[in-house]
Amino acid sequence: MDTNSIISQIGNTPLVKLKQASELTGCNIYGKAEYFNPGESVKDRAALFIVQDALNRNLISKGGTIVEGTAGNTGIGLAVVCKEYGLKLKIVIPNTQSIEKKETLKKLGAELIEVDAVPYSNPKNYIKQSKKIAEDLNKKSKNGVYWANQFDNLINAEAHIKTTAEEIWNQTAGLI
């Protein structure tokens, strides 16, 4: 196991039997303990794949910037991964998020752009603003700017097809 890199610790999380749910249903119910990932969530996998995809396609290079609109764990996962790859991270976040979440993101190196919390249908929605910010920054960046776009980025699902699904298959010896 490679222990020289925090991102090498993403994935291979335990599969644990959920005792009460199993007893109540009469079935064996399991859950992936994704809180064992460095960013403590399932979003670390997606963040890793999204960043690696952007790097592999030469959309960004070291010193480049990832931009994402997130109110949740994707931002923390991206912060962990971006730090490892020497990338900047700008998070567009609703100003209604907890101080603790915002402080965590800042301590992990993310620059926060706080915006009003408005419905997705509003052009000022944090996700739509993140796309616009990425487009504007990319016009003047020499190392590239990439909009992570977690909700529509197919790499997000690919992360789970290639890692989570395979882990579950192996951890259950194919008996699922």
Name what the model sees in each region.
Residues 1-176:
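PLP-dependent amino-acid enzyme catalytic core
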